[in-house]
Regions:
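One-carbon transfer enzymes
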Residues: 1-284
């Protein structure tokens, strides 16, 4: 039987990571903070890329300046507009856009792409040439009628669906990016975050939306800000592997539902550092 091999081929120098973002970049900022805290980092963010040039919307340039990382922006709506289009639905144009991005990534010798609130679907020129990972705000290991129940949902929409489905908690997941959205191999699931009490009797839709948004903000701090940097480090250290038939392993053990981050030493303690109490003024 052939042993599984690391999904990232180890090198002498740190793994070179590109962070893709479209908005606030809170996850990317936490990755950079974590990298900076390490004495001998196994990875480095060497490029920040954005598809949004509006500085009021995207904070990529600000984060890049803060941490001394090269920053490039190719506004995707401007790109589509140059083709006479007013939305970004045409995936043939997207492939052309991604082909240009891929050329930039090659110049930086990128090993891994971390999508951090990047709001454009990426195509084959990206994920077939570079190991690409994404974070999803719901538990993708839950299957219903043969499909991932919470695939294709974004932000508080994923949390709201979990709440309405009667889930007692949420988990964020990190997965490998493939052609079908949210359907790639599951790398990791975060520590669980319980809902605040029994929500089953709440019928006010607006109230449920506010609760979902609040829950997501806590989830970012407790689950995502802790998990994303750690998973990148674990990839860089060769601890995620894959066998010839595509089964994913963590530390040589098969993990069909991804590694459970609540079982990784230090994760739960680190999560609590981010778990400050929010008030409703935090929800915008």
């Amino acid at each position: 039987m052939t042993s599984p091999t690391p999904i990232y081929k180890l090198k002498k120098e740190p793994m070179r990571v590109a962070g893709f973002m479209s908005g606030s970049g809170s996850n990317l900022r936490e990755i950079l903070k974590y990298q900076k805290s390490l004495k001998n980092p196994s990875f480095r963010i060497v490029l920040i890329f954005s598809d949004v040039e509006d500085k009021n919307v995207c904070k990529g340039e600000k984060i890049a300046d803060e941490y001394g990382v090269p920053y490039f922006c190719n506004d995707i709506m401007r790109f589509y507009s140059s083709k006479g289009l007013h939305d970004k639905k045409d995936m043939d144009v997207r492939k052309e856009y991604d082909k240009n991005t891929a050329e930039l990534l090659k110049k930086f010798d990128i090993d891994l792409i971390a999508l951090c609130g990047y709001m454009s679907l990426v195509t084959e020129d990206i994920f077939e040439n570079f190991l690409t990972i994404n974070l999803h705000p719901a538990d993708l290991s839950i299957v219903e009628n043969g499909k991932r129940k919470y695939a294709g949902l974004q932000a508080e929409g994923a949390v709201l669906k979990a709440l309405l489905a009667g889930e007692t908690h949420t988990r964020s997941c990190i997965h490998v990016v493939r052609k079908d959205a949210d359907m790639g191999e599951l790398l990791a699931r975060s520590v669980p975050l319980e809902f605040m009490g029994d929500m089953s009797k709440i019928e006010d839709k607006n109230a449920l939306k506010i609760i979902s948004k609040y829950h997501l903000e806590v989830q970012k701090r407790v689950c995502e800000w802790t998990m994303y940097p750690k998973v990148i480090e674990l990839i860089a250290r060769g601890r995620f592997q894959k066998d010839k038939i595509g089964v994913l392993y963590f530390d040589d053990k098969p993990v069909p539902h991804g590694a459970d981050m609540s079982e990784i030493q230090g994760i739960s303690e680190h999560a609590q550092e981010h778990a400050r109490v929010l008030d409703m003024s935090d929800i915008k």
